[in-house]
Amino acid sequence: MPCTTILVGKNASYDGSTLVARNEDSSNGVFEPKRMRVVHPDEQPRVYASVLSHLTVELPDNPMRYTSVPDVIPGHGIWAEAGFNELNVGMSATETLTTNERVRGADPLVDYVPAKGNEGEDGYVPAQTGGLGEEDMVTLVLPYAKSARDGVRILGDLLERYGTYENNGIAFSDVDEIWWLETIGGHHWIAKRVPDDAYVTMPNQLGIDSFDLDDAEGAQVDHMCSADLRSWMAEWHLDLTLGVEGDGPAAVFNPREAFGSHSDSDHVYNTPRAWYMQRCLNPSDVWDGPDADYTPESDDIPWSRVPERKVTIEDIKYVLSSHYQGTEYDCYGSKGTPATRGAYRPIGINRNGQLAVLQLRPYAQPAYRAVQWMAFGSNSFNALVPLYANVETMPEYYADTQTRVTSENFYWANRLIGALADVRFHECGRAVEDYQEKVGGMGHKQIHDVDAAVAALPEAEAPAELARANEAFAQLVRVETDALLGKVLYTTSCAMKNSFAMNDNVR
């Protein structure tokens, strides 16, 4: 999926949490309805069948309960996207990545190839099963992962066995660590631990820019990889490090150069997003003019950086909702020219489907440690709401999305708000910002109050109480969301082209 990701290490976050956040964006012209779901062990398949690749995978018989954000429309797979399991392990999958021709030749993607002809007849060629993809990964890994590292190991084993038909980045988190895995070609992969004091920005482009092969093959303190990565790189001459003696890759090399891309489309679609996110979190750097440290089209924007101050939930929401505010590239702005205002792909885009922020709080007890912040629709116009993840059910307002457009659930209400407010962006802006600030404030208070209420309960009673708290908060969110919908509908209705000032009846 054409998504955007930010990862925040525990010492870089405002409260010591590990934070994993990703927009799930549909393809251009597609708007995929989303909902929330809790998957119980008896609902998890023991034999998984992929819709897109026709792959069948036998799964262990001991899955855990987990949260997910699946597609609503049936027929093309689950696409569970993001969630927590019972052990407070988080997973977000996937961020579609880029690669290059050398990698594609060295380890081709494992595409599904339909059968040719009719079985039993001359010339019949059976279908070729494809590999894993975004459709599958959360369902295949999250119910079984005991830690972030374990999630990397499980997915790595699956990739080496079955391969993949697309280039993807996947995040795993627990209360101590965040790991980022990038697939390389059809069967290879690398994974790197996010530094505790840093954040990571990921547009749809292979991102890791330094990798220690010795660590990955040894202690695995900060790096992991597929078993034959070194020999495979040597055979295909993939490392581009200058001055390396012998045939093998450098012990520390740049994966972005070896496996990634620097295409013209990257400079329109990908690098500007990393540039703007880091501009927000490290504002003292020089971002504009001839002396800029980095420009929107720079190929060397760092994968990870230490922020100038600790990063909050609101910072994450802002950068993942952004459309280059304050620059000549803002599609809603007045700076620059019409050409500059449409030059780069926004992060907050019309086809944002959902945003999941996975927060694991070290100061909270395991029974209520995991909070999954959620937003639906275009991020420029929506608000994040917190949900405790250790629950048996999700509130109907978030879970009962249907294909029918209605204001009765959170997904469609936000889609309607975005479509209406976009038309009169500046006139609706104050109401949208008030809504976002109010709902965000309500969310932080909700967490504080519920934490205190649940702290004294036996651990076994926590899920039911957390579910009640989620439901009560969903009803408050519904009231505020309905009110915003009414405001933007009124504002946009008043500005319709067929309006006329003369009346014949005044109430």
What are the language-model segments listed below?
Residues 21-34, 96, 181-183, 319-330, ...:
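Soluble extracytoplasmic regions of secretory-pathway and membrane proteins
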